[in-house]
Amino acid sequence: VLSVANKRSTAIEVMRPAGLWAMEQYGKQAVKWGNERAGIELPSGDRWLIHAANDSAGVGFSINMAFLDEAWSIPSQIFMGSIGPTMSERLMPQAWLVSTAGDSSSDLMASYRQRAIDHLGKEDPGNILLLEWSAPPTADPDDVETWKYASPEWNDKRNIHSGGE
């Protein structure tokens, strides 16, 4: 597994629960924190590597799974030029793009989302699985109820800065 994010510290945070588990199961030597070799290595040789989303992410490795956190801020050229090629020799590689929607410059997440939407209802669904938590397209973006649709962690006690509830 290669875990990347817009910041290396974010990628480490995603790995943290698995790292704590690996330490309990295999001892401290199974997990490295905070240096260039941060990640998990099991006695079987299986590894979970951590990297910032930059031009060298994954280069030199052959991986089965890439986990891209905060994919809205990872440019598509990082995935296509660095991370994607590391999976080219694998039989069933997976790339997981996890993210909020981002903005108009979020080309990686937006392009894969659109590819998945374009295959909806077709006989051949393609090879992209889209799991999305979002408001309906016709929802009013100024309505607090719409905000609740778009947030799986919504809490009614939030302080709404726009003068709402």
Model-predicted segments: where are they?
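Conserved nucleotide-state-sensing and coupling region of NTP-binding domains
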Residues: 2-54, 113, 117-131
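Conserved RecA-like ASCE ATPase "motif II neighborhood" in helicase/translocase motors
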Residues: 35-88
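Flexible loop/turn segments at secondary-structure boundaries
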Residues: 9-12, 48, 57-58, 74-75, ...
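Non-catalytic, compositionally simple segments
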Residues: 36-37, 77-165
